[in-house]
Amino acid sequence: MEVLMAERANLVFHNKAINGTAMKRLISRLIDHFGMAYTSHILDQVKTLGFQQATATSISLGIDDLLTIPSKGWLVQDAEQQSLILEKHHHYGNVHAVEKLRQSIEIWYATSEYLRQEMNPNFRMTDPFNPVHIMSFSGARGNASQVHQLVGMRGLMSDPQGQMIDLPIQSNLREGLSLTEYIISCYGARKGVVDTAVRTSDAGYLTRRLVEVVQHIVVRRTDCGTARGISVSPRNGMMPERIFIQTLIGRVLADDIYMGPRCIATRNQDIGIGLVNRFITFRAQPISIRTPFTCRSTSWICRLCYGRSPTHGDLVELGEAVGIIAGQSIGEPGTQLTLRTFHTGGVFTGGTAEHVRAPSNGKIKFNEDLVHPTRTRHGHPAFLCSIDLYVTIESEDILHNVNIPPKSLLLVQNDQYVESEQVIAEIRAGISTLNFKEKVRKHIYSDSDGEMHWSTDVYHAPEFTYGNVHLLPKTSHLWILLGRPCRSSLVYLSIHKDQDQMNAHFLSGKRRYTSNLSVTNDQARQKLFSSDFSGKKEDRIPDYSDLNRIICAGQYNLVYSPILHENSDLLSKRRRNKFIIPLHSIQELENELMPCSGISIEIPVNGIFRRNSILAYFDDPRYRRKSSGIIKYGTVETHSVIKKEDLLEYRGVKEFRPKYQMKVDRFFFIPEEVHILPGSSSIMVRNNSIVGVDTQITLNLRSRVGGLVRVERKKKRIELKIFSGDIHFPGETDKISRHTGVLIPPGTGKRNSKESKKVKNWIYVQRITPSKKKFFVLVRPVVTYEITDGINLATLFPPDPLQERDNVQLRIVNYILYGNGKPIRGISDTSIQLVRTCLVLNWNQDKKSSSCEEARASFVEIRTNGLIRHFLRINLVKSPISYIGKRNDPSGSGLLSDNGSDCTNINPFSSIYSYSKAKIQQSINQPQGTIHTLLNRNKECQSLIILSAANCSRMGPFKDVKYHSVIKKSIKKDPLIPIRNSLGPLGTSLPIENFYSSYHLITHNQILVTNYLQLDNLKQTFQVIKFKYYLMDENGKIFNPDPCRNIILNPFNLNWYFLHHNYCEETSKIISLGQFICENVCIAKNGPPLKSGQVILVQVDSIVIRSAKPYLATPGATVHGHYGETLYEGDTLVTFIYEKSRSGDITQGLPKVEQVLEVRSVDSISMNLEKRIEGWNKCITRILGIPWGFLIGAELTIAQSRISLVNKIQQVYRSQGVQIHNRHLEIIVRQITSKVLVSEDGMSNVFSPGELIGLLRAERMGRALEEAICYRVVLLGITRASLNTQSFISEASFQETARVLAKAALRGRIDWLKGLKENVVLGGVIPVGTGFKGLVHPSKQHNNIPLETKKKNLFEGEMRDILFHHKKLFDSCLSKNFHDIPEQSFIGFNDS
């Protein structure tokens, strides 16, 4: 008794509240001290005590017990304020979407975390006996997260994909949620429910597959005798100490470990906690341990390679079914973890970085050479320090020194005044946080339609031009210049050229348009949109659909017609200096039966044109005939223009014939059917007989028309013609009959005939004499063609205000291809072209260049945005001016009509040359938009963008400016002109006298720009020319002077700013044309704040900005699309790749584990592979070039891939706070990686190619046969591995039963019943269990000579193991030289 009393007196009395962790420690020490049975009694007493106390307390829970944290209100308000500022920055283009999302998540996460930390102290101070507090913080019911949702705020939720919903729930469950919050909360809660249902089954299936792979692995031997192991080093800092201890405890050493000369641990010794601590204190060299990877037995495992059993802490017993234990211990946490998510209901968890705060107020100083500027994750500017940085803070009387660790971000500038507790630096959340990060792609989509522009920081380098992936070298902006692209199936190519003014509602109407020429210019002019100076637009926007696509340009009405179909081939076909541009005329769009015709541009072979040469011709389909016939010019006077031998091609038949090209107003075509037959053929009809339609003429020929037959026999062939028409037998008095071959105009009656009918159409009278006495008259129908004379294209080009002489003239002439009365023969079914529309080239006879008799022409290929365009360049030889006309303009042709006539003449050349210069008449009365054509994604058709009045805003004082009165007067005089013409944002101004203006002009020619800039400075008055702007890229080249870009600019897209008059000198320095301006940048001292956009016009007192939206992109982001491409709303602009923390539940983890175990690829390949290769093992160079290096390389690859698989799976589980011993994973990974694929048929024919065999089996077979077997290692997924086991019964019970059994039967496979499953299926005794010693053979002792090495590292250790393992193989296959010194060479290699 006394002894007991004395012992009691010695016991230490702890007066402490015991919590969960303390309880765990107590239990483990009790077990160590007393053993299992005794401990369980002690714990029973503790349990009883607990129940008694709880009954006495009798806790009840009411809603009043949920106390809200008082500081919540201002915390939430603060967070909202920060979010607002952030939104503004994003709008101005200072941060991009990823940074914004990341920062807003961190703001709310930090708020939520802060509330959670306040919770415990709050309860402790206000109400320590609060039942909620007692229950949750003792761990009896509920955890901190749930209580936080009840009394703090619910915070951020995840959606079912595990992504963040960036709208936080600010209320807690005690206050109640608003409707929006409730819906978001349901979203998160649903995720919890779904996960519980779905993921539980997933986890179960995972467990089943895992067990299937490893069910046959049992401990069968004590020692397999391997000399290999895996090196684990505490030194390399990659592995935290905790994980290092976990890895080592319970393993067996593969090698002796020395501390200097002393051996502190021997081979095959198992490692306990004491030994591990000694390793850590001594910082010993890498420790080589045995793992299941290195075990040499094929289908089981030995005790030493497995290590200690987790149940009782001694070496594992023989007959233990370690495989099944491994499978279950990996699968089981999955089910547990899914259940855990259910209760928290999808609340997001993330991580925040640690901050360094200033200790007191003062000025901060640091060495600026040690830091370099960078951006933080949230887009704030900061300094990155690469080494330890000492920061001093000087307050009035003391200096504070703060040490900032490397890789941290410094958030303040040098010499800045900081206040106490201000955040001055952010420590990078390093490897210490076990958050599982992953790379995510985030696409940024465009908010509006428009045209894409990059800042000059994106490379326009040639190698990037053709790909659609543009990597950003540094942080820069992408701009979307606003404008409305018109989507349509027909590409609207027409006479609209770049910078034409046109209707903004132009293309929104119907698809097919008819020309309606009744609208006169005055009507059209009144209907145009007008707005007064203050920027208000009229209430009524007129409907333009009745204008029917008419543009009033000077004296022509240009009718807009959709010409080209988008499928037609835009690139021309090229035949020997001849280009054909495909073209559809209007009629073809309606019936689409006629074959395609095109404009052909012909250049003489030597490339030299004389005067009046034909440059191009167009075969008009209206003048095309299928049948043969005769052309008559009638009474019209003809004059021959050019007579030249020309080569005509009709379906490959080439004939030289003189081509009479006559210029006539009207001609007649008399159709006839002609058959040319060989002389020997028999004809079934008589000469001068009359036949009907479809009469048989010869054996295989029938007539197409009815009429009179004429047969003429030539030398070797017979010509048979059939004339259609009426036959008259006139009386003798009939005068008309004496003439043959006469054209009679309509309106003349026939004399002396019984019916005095008037002739309605032209007819052709022909006298036919079948015999000497009889004759009759054949009246044949005539097709009449009117040719209107072509328009001289010179009228399309107004005189150039720049007084540059434009020498080249082009005019259009229609020529008839056949002479008067010439018979025209069609060859088989080809159609015959009667009239050809030609473009005749001429030039002025200048006094200076009068000697210029010839012009050189050539095709120029220009490549823009991947589409090749051809330009035709005509050079007057002695004249310095070169003229570039637009040739393969996909716009085909437009319709031009004479002013008064109602007959439209197809003029295919109008569009080809209508944009030769970047200038258009001043008098164009402008509707409201400017066109821009852009290339589409598919690079075939163009799309237009209309910039119209919807994007225009003007600001600024009008009262100060005096000379506007001139404008107002002129407007009163001529009320038809809309006000916006007077000072339109599109740069056109009325030619008002002394209108004081200084436009900066942007034209195609840089030279002109400089001249005008000088004029500006001289403040001269001049007439404003319509502007065309350009942009410069980073090389200073002018980007995109291509006249074929069309966006319809809409005045609402243009912002018009008025500045004070005296501001001109300063402005010109700050604002340059084409410059992009972010929102809220003030250009004047008291000027208006600007909207973001691009400056397209600078004037004395105002600038015009085309509104644009900036998007920020950081380095490494991928830009989609091309410079200047049209984008629609919702198109992808940029893709960011960023890292984010996974949300805190296994939902994301389990699929990850499964992905690794099924060996699916996880990571996307990074764009810069060079960086990956740099990080490879430095020792790799030592392997290369050694005779057996390839073998070592292969071994190392297998070992390395196994280790990295294990690490990947461990990462997922550790991030969930689940501890699984590595050896379980190793057993499974060993099974996945232990099969090889036989790749070549060796001489021995042991294995067939493509067969999967065990790795060890292949090695043994190679040694036995003394010849190499070629194989490659494959990573099988767990499903495939369980279908490729030794036993077909276990395979069949897993999946595809019928197939597996049928195959096994055909192959005659034998099942040795080594595993558990087979025996369970067949009802036998399972060959496992620690009592089952029957199958175990005493292990053979291998007398191996370990190689003595003192200095080792990971690489040498593995190298030695591999060499040792393959020693016999080397001895057999290495050459004689190696035979003499094998032992020394190994040792030398290791000592190096």
From Swiss-Prot:
Tell me where on the tree of life, at the top rank, the source sits: Eukaryota
Could you say which protein family the record assigns here?
Belongs to the RNA polymerase beta' chain family. RpoC2 subfamily.
Q: How is the cofactor bound?
A: Binds 1 Zn(2+) ion per subunit.
Q: What class of enzyme is it?
A: transferase
Keyword Plastid present in the record's keywords: the answer is yes
This entry's Enzyme Commission designation comes to: 2.7.7.6
Residues that bind Zn(2+), according to the entry?
Answer: C224, C295, C302, C305
A single BP term in Gene Ontology: DNA-templated transcription
Q: Which UniProt keywords apply?
A: Chloroplast, DNA-directed RNA polymerase, Metal-binding, Nucleotidyltransferase, Plastid, Transcription, Transferase, Zinc
The UniProt entry, under NCBIfam families, shows: rpoC2_cyan
What is the protein's quaternary organization? In plastids the minimal PEP RNA polymerase catalytic core is composed of four subunits: alpha, beta, beta', and beta''. When a (nuclear-encoded) sigma factor is associated with the core the holoenzyme is formed, which can initiate transcription.
What biological function has been recorded for the protein in this entry?
DNA-dependent RNA polymerase catalyzes the transcription of DNA into RNA using the four ribonucleoside triphosphates as substrates.
A GO molecular-function term, please? DNA-directed RNA polymerase activity
Q: Which cofactor does it need?
A: Zn(2+)
Tell me yes or no: is Hydrolase among this UniProt entry's keywords: no
Name of the protein this chain belongs to: DNA-directed RNA polymerase subunit beta''
Reactions that this protein is recorded to catalyse: RNA(n) + a ribonucleoside 5'-triphosphate = RNA(n+1) + diphosphate
Give the UniProt entry's GO cellular component terms: chloroplast; DNA-directed RNA polymerase complex; mitochondrion
Extract the PANTHER family matched here.
DNA-DIRECTED RNA POLYMERASE SUBUNIT BETA
Where in or outside the cell is it found? Plastid, Chloroplast
